[in-house]
Design a protein with these regions (language model features):
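Kelch-like beta-propeller repeat domains
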Residues: 1-220
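Acidic, low-complexity intrinsically disordered segments
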Residues: 219-341
Length: 341
């Protein structure tokens, strides 16, 4: 139990864990992979020592693993392709309480006293980015394995709670979705498509639950391929559709920075102007080196009740061939949890 479990291509990996929940439980260092096509288990390279209740994230064929017991200055890295482990000595010593992968980027949830914040880890440089915004809603605690949908990290405490916190890895903002129907502990979050599931748990005065709650995230992701020529400029058209006055959508644009360069935040306005907001467009995040731009598009004019809101982003091709552009639209709308029958 309490192993790290994740899916990679057609395999499910199980790393570490412990033999039971008792005080005499033995820590496990074993690693196994289950192939969903052959329905066979395969033994993989062991951890250096037994580990349980790990924080972990997957990025570019590698798994990054942190101990959640006390502070650490190390991360263990598993190479899926070569079936080997290595240890990286980190640039600082910190208390890691969770980790998540967002579009092949590694984020680590750290605590400092009662404060907690997400921080991006750059494996190629073995460096941490600047500290993210401190969570304004809750103090540091023990959290279950987070789930990710369209650049947002969803997390819930293992102790009694009905609250689910959300961290937007692109805009560096915290929020909360509507509360779950049941106040429970040890419930597990899982994600599939645009749906979040809260599975099982324990309810005070009732016992172990066999219920599943479901929450649907209002998000639309479009992935398209562009044929480009190295050195040529192009315009990425971002269309939020017809928005009524005051209605808003968050638009996240992702390109491969090795294949395409974002030249400016907009073809119409300067970066500073967009940060303040102009003609219904506000720049929330601009990271051209990572191929990321986040905009908030708000309906600001009336034209028969609604009008089409769009933005144009200038880019330059760094390759000749095909490259992929991902555009995600998230609507600022409150949804409710429901029970899965």
């Amino acid at each position: 139990c309490r192993a790290a479990v994740f899916a990679y291509n057609n395999e499910i990996y199980v790393i570490g864990g412990q033999t039971d929940t008792g005080v005499t439980a033995k820590l496990l260092k074993s690693v196994y992979a289950y192939n969903t096509e052959t329905r066979q288990w395969q033994k993989k390279a062991d951890l250096a020592e037994g580990r349980t209740n790990l924080a972990y994230a997957c990025s570019k064929d590698k798994i990054y693993v942190w101990s959640k017991a006390g502070t650490t200055d190390q991360a263990e890295i598993y190479d899926i392709k070569t079936d080997t482990w290595e240890t990286a000595v980190l640039p600082d010593t910190s208390a890691v309480i969770a980790a998540a992968s967002v579009d092949n980027r590694v984020f680590v949830l750290k605590e400092d006293g009662e404060k907690m914040f997400w921080q991006e880890y750059l494996p190629e440089d073995n460096l941490f980015e600047d500290v993210g915004t401190v969570c304004p809603f809750a103090a540091s605690d023990i959290y279950g394995t987070p789930v990710v949908i369209s650049g947002k990290i969803y997390m819930a405490k293992t102790e009694e709670t009905k609250e689910v916190l959300v961290y937007d890895a692109y805009s560096d903002e915290w929020s909360r979705i509507s509360d779950m129907n049941l106040t429970k502990k040890d419930s597990m979050l899982a994600a599939s498509g645009n749906d979040i599931y809260s599975i099982g748990g324990e309810l005070a005065g009732f016992g172990v639950l066999d219920t599943v709650e479901q929450y649907t995230v209002k998000v639309q992701t479009t992935t398209k391929q562009m044929a480009v020529n190295q050195g040529e400029s192009y315009e990425l058209q971002v269309n939020a559709g017809n928005l009524k006055k005051g209605q808003a959508k968050i638009v996240t644009v992702n390109v491969n920075p090795e294949e395409m360069k974002i030249q400016n935040a907009s073809s119409f306005e300067t970066e500073d102007t967009l940060k303040e907001g102009a003609d219904g467009v506000t720049l929330l995040k601009y990271q051209p080196k990572k191929g990321v731009i986040v905009l908030k598009l708000t309906g600001s004019l009336e034209r028969g009740g609604s009008y089409e809101t769009y933005q144009s982003i200038p880019v330059e091709a760094k390759i000749t061939g095909k490259t992929t552009v991902e555009i995600t639209l998230t609507e600022e709308k409150i949804m409710m949890w429901g029970f899965v029958r």
